[in-house]
């Protein structure tokens, strides 16, 4: 079934009264060229499983299905379910719709066998960062997904790919750099969305590392949270609540340094020093 045989998105939104809700962080994409570009960025999707979070009225969903994917769409806004069901009727057996909150979803249980899914989504802005953190810290590793192609506010995208000694470097950059290889694929202007956000957006492509540096995710999460929670303070101060003096001595890291100067490898060393 061709994507062209579906009614225009604007018509669907009017018919189902689907004005985006600010409380849900919704910004809908109408540009079919753009949604197709996002789908292509995820790679060859023919007969491949894809997880989409926050599909809304299904603009990106249509593009993923048109590329031949088997899509599992997770949507918490009940208003959108009927519009998604109409798309599913055009692609029998290719669109599974799960009504619920992605933050409460057990993603590892969605695909118990077969190829690993790719995650492709225009994430709701109010939960996008937390979802990414959950996916970066998931156990076991390698993770349940083979790649992620995700839309974020530009500022969040820059934090994901940031390197030490840069303005955007922080906890997100350390965790992403430890377990994945991430790049900003392209930017998306505000006028591509309804309603237009006040900032530029970016699509980030993320591929898991098969063998990241050995480290407990929980420990690294704790270290980075403490270090960047007081990022302007020296490490001997910011890590004080978690026994920082002993950790710094054990790793040979200068306690007068600040969090943004440490490499991913140094953060991993601190996390491993937490082990008894």
Curated annotation (Swiss-Prot):
Its EC number is 2.1.1.182. This is Ribosomal RNA small subunit methyltransferase A. The keyword Transcription does not apply. The lineage of its organism: Bacteria, Pseudomonadati, Pseudomonadota, Alphaproteobacteria, Hyphomicrobiales. Specifically dimethylates two adjacent adenosines (A1518 and A1519) in the loop of a conserved hairpin near the 3'-end of 16S rRNA in the 30S particle. May play a critical role in biogenesis of 30S subunits. Keywords: Cytoplasm, Methyltransferase, RNA-binding, rRNA processing, S-adenosyl-L-methionine, Transferase. It is found in: Cytoplasm. PANTHER family: DIMETHYLADENOSINE TRANSFERASE, DIMETHYLADENOSINE TRANSFERASE-RELATED. S-adenosyl-L-methionine binds at residues 27, 29, 54, 75, 101, 122. The gene is rsmA. GO terms for cellular component: cytosol. It catalyses: adenosine(1518)/adenosine(1519) in 16S rRNA + 4 S-adenosyl-L-methionine = N(6)-dimethyladenosine(1518)/N(6)-dimethyladenosine(1519) in 16S rRNA + 4 S-adenosyl-L-homocysteine + 4 H(+). GO terms for molecular function: 16S rRNA (adenine(1518)-N(6)/adenine(1519)-N(6))-dimethyltransferase activity; RNA binding. It is an enzyme of class 2 (transferase). InterPro entries: KsgA/Erm, rRNA_Ade_diMease-like_C, rRNA_Ade_Mease_Trfase_CS, rRNA_Ade_methylase_Trfase_N, rRNA_adenine_dimethylase, SAM-dependent_MTases_sf. It holds the Pfam family RrnaAD. Belongs to the class I-like SAM-binding methyltransferase superfamily. rRNA adenine N(6)-methyltransferase family. RsmA subfamily.
